[in-house]
Amino acid sequence: SACLVGSEMCIRDRSKGHALILPKSHAANIYELSDEMAAKAMILAKKMATAMTAALKCDGFNIVQNNGECAGQTVFHFHMHLIPRYKGDQVGITWHPGELSDADKEEILLKVKEQLS
């Protein structure tokens, strides 16, 4: 892979055109990322996804960002994967949602709201 840091593309091989957004300043994960860098990363992700979709003629697009080992994080420097998708590409980014009761959903919502206030 040809990796450059900052707003340059880091080309990977998961899918034709798979790239990374990799900030120059270190943050191990999203929790350590400054609000300013988080905003810049998302704005760049939108611009790159739009340009890559037009350039590569892909059928869809995934933007993936993992935090913590159990979530699949293996590189402990914040980064976002930009993954162009093509019909029949067999790239495996799927999960099977569980089911929660309305009471469980409400409890989760209340706990998160408490942390936000």
Predicted regions: what they are:
Residues 68-75:
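Acidic pyrophosphate-coordinating catalytic loop
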Residues 20-42, 94-101:
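Short histidine-centered catalytic/ligand-binding loop motif
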Residues 84-117:
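C-terminal helix-cap and adjacent tail motif
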Residues 1-6, 11:
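Single conserved hydrophobic/aromatic residue that forms the stacking wall/gate
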Residues 7, 23, 41, 79-80:
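Divalent metal-coordination and catalytic microenvironments
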